[in-house]
């Protein structure tokens, strides 16, 4: 697909089936934009082209092509405030409908990205505008993208915007400078297995149930948002996140999210291996019965110990945790199978800072009532705290770190001033398989319902996550180096992202 074609996209896609249309739209990626002939000419002539300016240039030309097709002109209207042209959508070059994307080694003229006379702003002009966009305007553009991409994996545009982005799932690998399958540009397509018994389908079903549980029993009267689209990092254009759920956030009259200063982020984890059956021969069920009848730290430890790699690792103070489990504790009661641990050293300074920030945090445990005993009503049976905290060596910690950074930028540069501070949580959901004794229809609290196809929730562990400022800035700089390295490997004239983008701003929780 040509980013600069003057042929309306509706006409180009006319007559195509839905799968064919989806494939065509998926060609409008940041990678293909950087490989377009006119863009390569511009990058070759302007060796100092940087991000986030080039990312916003891409966004401008993308919505010049797809805005009318998707029936949303919000993004172009924001650009139009700065372009000085009557129609911000007239950025398409003269073309005959052929693709403007070519291989890196093809011969080409040195036009510097200029458009044909009378067509609209050329690439250098758009780049100059994007270089000077105020951060608040970048936030508005990025929030408009979020609104358009709600639905996440069910939304075709959501996957398009993830190209060239270090997302939450890729951030850990970027910080650790690992060469893995987490490719940033033209990534391998995500193969989603929605077979009902697959771990992915299980996780999606249970995630929706956990959102309802949190809204009913944790968030109370707070405004919650359970359908958040792609949130691009407005200041740098190389990071992006898709939140599972957030609280103290609202949707304004312009359909843009408004994060309050005391917003809350919830990252939900429902592991398939925690699922068990309500039958006598399932050893995990026997331990759950003890937990259900006598809710306490002791019965919780016994229940979790029945799971292979049971989420919580015992680590004495001054020792190095492994990367196996995403929760830690220094409470000796959890040390059921003593193992030797390596000592923390000065080389582990960032890890030490993270451990010190989180080691005194407590997790809240919610034991849920069994709907087979309560006529289908799921409520809180017991609530207590345990000395369990996040493992900063685990990839989940870095997922939350990036979510914190992106949302914090929106609070800093777009939200109205207010009291409070951004909070982050990781929520561990435990479920059991449905039994013949379970009602088909179950209610959650006073307003929520449980999907009849979903397993039965039995337990939630709510863990606060604290992120030191020094670890945020260090991680972002390392990840930006990874982005630059990946771009140099992919493109002959890549745009550049400066580490100075991450040197300012109050990032302290």
From Swiss-Prot:
<keyword id="KW-1048">Host nucleus</keyword>
<keyword id="KW-0269">Exonuclease</keyword>
<comment type="similarity">
    <text>Belongs to the herpesviridae alkaline nuclease family.</text>
</comment>
<feature type="site" description="Required for function">
    <location>
        <position position="267"/>
    </location>
</feature>
<feature type="compositionally biased region" description="Basic and acidic residues">
    <location>
        <begin position="90"/>
        <end position="104"/>
    </location>
</feature>
<keyword id="KW-1190">Host gene expression shutoff by virus</keyword>
<dbReference type="InterPro" id="IPR034720">
    <property type="entry name" value="Viral_alk_exo"/>
</dbReference>
<dbReference type="GO" id="GO:0003723">
    <property type="term" value="F:RNA binding"/>
</dbReference>
<dbReference type="GO" id="GO:0004527">
    <property type="term" value="F:exonuclease activity"/>
</dbReference>
<dbReference type="InterPro" id="IPR011335">
    <property type="entry name" value="Restrct_endonuc-II-like"/>
</dbReference>
<keyword id="KW-1035">Host cytoplasm</keyword>
<dbReference type="Pfam" id="PF01771">
    <property type="entry name" value="Viral_alk_exo"/>
</dbReference>
<keyword id="KW-0694">RNA-binding</keyword>
<keyword id="KW-0945">Host-virus interaction</keyword>
<dbReference type="GO" id="GO:0039595">
    <property type="term" value="P:symbiont-mediated degradation of host mRNA"/>
</dbReference>
<keyword id="KW-1132">Decay of host mRNAs by virus</keyword>
<comment type="function">
    <text>Plays a role in processing non linear or branched viral DNA intermediates in order to promote the production of mature packaged unit-length linear progeny viral DNA molecules. Exhibits endonuclease and exonuclease activities and accepts both double-stranded and single-stranded DNA as substrate. Exonuclease digestion of DNA is in the 5'-&gt; 3' direction and the products are 5'-monophosphate nucleosides. Additionally, forms a recombinase with the major DNA-binding protein, which displays strand exchange activity.</text>
</comment>
<feature type="site" description="Required for function">
    <location>
        <position position="244"/>
    </location>
</feature>
<dbReference type="GO" id="GO:0004519">
    <property type="term" value="F:endonuclease activity"/>
</dbReference>
<keyword id="KW-0255">Endonuclease</keyword>
<protein>
    <recommendedName>
        <fullName>Shutoff alkaline exonuclease</fullName>
        <ecNumber>3.1.-.-</ecNumber>
    </recommendedName>
</protein>
<keyword id="KW-1192">Host mRNA suppression by virus</keyword>
<keyword id="KW-0378">Hydrolase</keyword>
<keyword id="KW-0244">Early protein</keyword>
<feature type="region of interest" description="Disordered">
    <location>
        <begin position="90"/>
        <end position="120"/>
    </location>
</feature>
<dbReference type="GO" id="GO:0030430">
    <property type="term" value="C:host cell cytoplasm"/>
</dbReference>
<feature type="site" description="Required for function">
    <location>
        <position position="269"/>
    </location>
</feature>
<keyword id="KW-0540">Nuclease</keyword>
<dbReference type="GO" id="GO:0042025">
    <property type="term" value="C:host cell nucleus"/>
</dbReference>
<dbReference type="GO" id="GO:0039657">
    <property type="term" value="P:symbiont-mediated suppression of host gene expression"/>
</dbReference>
<dbReference type="InterPro" id="IPR001616">
    <property type="entry name" value="Herpes_alk_exo"/>
</dbReference>
<comment type="subunit">
    <text>Forms a complex with the DNA polymerase, the DNA polymerase processivity factor, and the major DNA binding protein.</text>
</comment>
<feature type="site" description="Required for function">
    <location>
        <position position="207"/>
    </location>
</feature>
<keyword id="KW-1262">Eukaryotic host gene expression shutoff by virus</keyword>
<dbReference type="GO" id="GO:0003677">
    <property type="term" value="F:DNA binding"/>
</dbReference>
């Amino acid at each position: 697909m040509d980013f600069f074609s003057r042929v309306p996209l509706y006409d180009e896609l006319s007559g195509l089936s839905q799968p064919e249309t989806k494939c065509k739209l998926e060609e409008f990626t940041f990678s293909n934009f950087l490989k377009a002939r006119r863009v390569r000419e511009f990058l070759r002539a302007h060796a100092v082209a940087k991000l986030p300016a080039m990312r916003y240039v891409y966004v401008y030309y993308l919505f010049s092509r797809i805005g009318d097709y998707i029936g949303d002109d919000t993004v172009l209207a924001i650009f139009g405030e700065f372009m000085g042209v009557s129609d911000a959508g007239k950025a398409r070059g003269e073309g005959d409908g052929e693709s403007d994307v070519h291989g890196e080694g093809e011969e080409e003229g040195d036009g510097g990205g200029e458009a044909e006379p009378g067509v609209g702003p050329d690439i250098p002009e758009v780049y100059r505008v994007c270089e000077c966009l105020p951060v608040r305007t970048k936030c508005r553009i990025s929030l408009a993208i979020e609104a358009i991409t709600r639905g996440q994996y069910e939304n075709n545009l959501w996957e398009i915007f993830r190209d060239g982005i270090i997302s939450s799932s890729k951030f850990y690998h970027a910080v650790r400078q690992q060469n893995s399958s987490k490719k940033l540009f033209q990534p391998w397509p995500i193969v989603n297995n929605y077979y009902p018994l697959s771990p992915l389908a299980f996780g999606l079903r249970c995630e929706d149930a956990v959102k309802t549980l949190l809204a009913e029993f944790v968030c109370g009267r707070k405004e919650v948002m359970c359908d958040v689209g792609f949130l691009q990092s407005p200041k740098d254009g190389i990071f992006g996140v898709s939140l599972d759920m957030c609280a103290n956030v609202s949707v304004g009259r312009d359909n843009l999210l408004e994060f309050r200063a005391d917003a809350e982020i919830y990252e939900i984890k429902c592991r398939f291996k925690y699922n068990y059956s309500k039958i006598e021969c399932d050893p995990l069920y026997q331990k759950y019965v003890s937990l259900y009848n006598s809710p306490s730290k002791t019965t919780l430890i016994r229940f979790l110990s029945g799971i292979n790699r049971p989420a919580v690792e015992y680590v004495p103070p001054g020792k190095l945790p492994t990367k196996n489990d995403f929760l830690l504790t220094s409470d000796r009661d959890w040390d059921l199978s003593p193992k030797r641990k390596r000592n923390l050293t000065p080389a582990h300074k960032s890890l030490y800072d993270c451990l010190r920030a989180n080691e005194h945090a407590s997790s809240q445990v919610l034991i849920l009532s069994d709907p087979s005993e309560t006529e289908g009503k799921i409520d809180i049976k017991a609530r207590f705290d345990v000395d369990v905290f996040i493992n900063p060596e685990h990839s989940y910690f870095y997922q939350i770190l990036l979510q914190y950074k992106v949302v914090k930028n929106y609070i800093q540069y777009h939200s109205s001033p207010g009291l409070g501070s951004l909070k982050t949580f990781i929520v561990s959901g435990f479920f059991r398989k449905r039994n013949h004794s379970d009602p088909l229809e179950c209610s959650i609290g006073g307003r929520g319902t449980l999907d009849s196809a979903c397993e039965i929730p039995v337990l939630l562990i709510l863990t606060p996550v604290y992120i030191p400022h020094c670890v945020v800035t260090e991680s972002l700089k390392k990840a930006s180096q990874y982005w630059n390295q990946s771009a140099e490997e992919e493109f002959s004239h890549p745009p550049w992202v400066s580490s100075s983008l991450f040197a300012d701003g109050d990032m302290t929780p």
